[in-house]
Regions:
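Condensing-enzyme catalytic core mediating Claisen C-C bond formation in acyl metabolism
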Residues: 1-52, 158-244, 376, 381-459
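Conserved beta-ketoacyl condensing-enzyme motif
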Residues: 9, 52-123, 244-245, 250-276
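Acidic, glycine-rich active-site loops and adjacent beta-strand->loop/helix elements
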Residues: 13-15, 82-89, 116-122, 146-152, ...
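Conserved catalytic cysteine-centered active-site region
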Residues: 36-40, 44-57, 86-142, 280-345
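Buried hydrophobic packing segments
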Residues: 59-66, 98, 125-132, 222-226, ...
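Flexible, glycine-rich active-site loops centered on histidine and acidic residues
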Residues: 134-169
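A conserved active-site cap/scaffold subdomain adjacent to cofactor or substrate pockets
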Residues: 212-239, 250-251, 255-257, 261-285, ...
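C-terminal catalytic subdomain
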Residues: 302-310, 325-405
Length: 459
């Protein structure tokens, strides 16, 4: 049986709100030490929404722009799936709202639905779409995957790690960014590090230190499973194919990926995570030279102890600094300006990477992608650059797009948070946030009627 080749991401689009918060101003506003957010977390600014936007309006903007920017026929789409952790309805999906973009063309045969598990939903939707194209159920049409979220916190200390936005991706065969089928490691388990059990509020319950520990532990688990799968593939074929480079013979994951993008709650966590991969490579190695530069007292740490050992953390970050600057730093340039976009975070990081490397030299490179969703669901997987990425880079124009946002004051941000808090769960509600700074053609929430039905307008 023949399968479609190079199934993956054919096109990408991103939508971010028209305004953002300057983190250096927020430091002053909150009375914390200078650099706590900008240096300590690596965050420059943060997207945020007023009561005029919700997860559906963000998605409407990203998908409508994807269709128009790439001149995609709505009837050429056979699957539409949304990853989100910001739904406001326990029954009606975000995807169902997006069907309004396809019905005018007569397309009501869209498979797929919402998928939810914290920040992992977008990745699960991507895997589902790729699997659909590669299956006997495929009808020959492309799929669209949407990752849309709004991150906002009740606790003052957590608010700098908020964000908002949506990434939409066209999925199909002969893609310039194809999923490497044999480069994947998954780790899933049970934890209460971050969750949203209270449907009366928009805010999560967060155990910050535990969530970071879970993130790093999940990366370890994905690393281990990836190594097991690659070893199985190597044992069967004794060759390196399907995106696995010949130099993987070294057994080092650090040698496997040319570039990497991570789910980015904050940018400092990304540098720590990249260093953690080096530590895992050392643990896997039988060569004592692999531990060069790492103090002897760190060689025999128990796993749980290693997750919180600051000396180890600083050591591996230092040892990987040069490689990080080349292979990973391009992926955090946009997230540092956007904040945490939850399900869209990893794919904002991917767009950032593509936008800040030389597109001409990217073909043939393997990008490592680490997706993490609290609770816990996580996967470390590979995307192979199998075509020209320049069209995506040029049409998204990411960094220039971010530069056009209005930089709000902390007071304006706090007012927006207050509006959202008052509006959440309301009926008979008319939003009062301004639409003045929204670009022409932007979808926004117009009203919520007495039956909680939402109406969206377009500027």
């Amino acid at each position: 049986m023949s399968y479609p080749e190079n199934v993956g991401i054919k096109a990408m689009e991103i939508y971010v709100p028209a305004q953002c918060l300057d983190q250096s101003l927020f430091e002053i506003h909150q009375g914390v030490s200078a650099g706590k957010y900008t240096i300590g977390l690596g965050l420059e600014s943060m997207n945020y929404c007023t009561d005029r936007e919700d997860v559906c309006s963000l998605a409407l903007n990203a998908v409508s722009s994807l269709l128009s920017t790439y001149n995609i026929d709505p009837n050429s789409i056979g699957r539409l799936e949304v990853g989100t952790e910001s739904p406001f309805d326990k029954a009606k999906s975000v995807k169902s709202v997006l069907t309004q973009l396809f019905e005018p063309a007569g397309n009501t045969s869209l498979e797929g639905i919402d998928t939810v598990n914290a920040c992992y939903g977008g990745t699960n939707a991507l895997f589902n779409a790729v699997n659909w194209v590669e299956s006997r159920s495929w009808d020959g049409r492309d799929a669209i995957v949407v990752a849309s979220d709004i991150a906002i916190y009740k606790e003052t200390a957590s608010r700098p790690t908020g964000g908002a936005g949506c990434v939409a991706m066209l999925i199909g065969p002969n893609a310039p960014l194809s999923l490497a089928p044999n480069v994947r490691g998954t780790y899933m388990t049970h934890a209460y590090d971050f969750y949203k059990p209270d449907f009366s509020v928009e805010y999560p319950i967060v155990n910050g230190h535990e969530s970071i520990r879970c993130y790093i532990s999940a990366l370890d688990g994905c690393y281990k499973n990836l190594q097991e799968r690659l070893q199985q593939k190597h044992d069967k074929s004794n060759t390196s194919t399907n995106g696995v480079k010949p130099d993987y013979e070294t057994g080092r994951v650090m040698d496997l990926f040319d570039y990497m993008a991570f789910h980015t709650p904050n940018c400092k966590l990304v540098s720590k995570s990249y260093g953690r991969l080096l530590y895992n490579d050392c643990l896997m190695s039988t060569d004592e030279a692999a531990w060069q530069g790492i103090p002897e007292e760190l060689l025999n740490l128990q796993h749980q102890e290693s997750l919180t050992n600051k000396i180890l953390e600083k050591t591996v970050v230092s040892l990987t600094k040069e490689a990080f600057q080349t292979r990973v730093e391009p992926s955090i340039l946009a997230p540092s300006k956007c904040g945490n976009m939850y399900t869209a975070s990893l794919y904002c990081s991917l767009l950032s990477l593509l936008s800040n490397i030389d597109a001409k030299d990217a073909r043939g490179k393997l990008i490592g992608m680490f997706s993490y969703g609290s609770g816990i669901a996580s996967t470390l997987f590979g995307i192979k650059v199998t075509g020209d990425i320049s069209e995506i880079v040029q049409k998204v124009d990411l960094m220039n797009r971010l530069a056009r946002r209005y930089i709000a004051t902390p007071e304006e941000y706090e007012e927006a948070c207050s509006l959202r808090s008052k509006a959440y769960g309301r009926k008979n509600y008319t939003p009062t946030g301004s639409v003045e700074r929204m670009a022409p053609g932007t979808y926004y929430l117009e009203s919520i009627d007495e039956s909680y039905c939402r109406t969206y307008a377009r500027k």
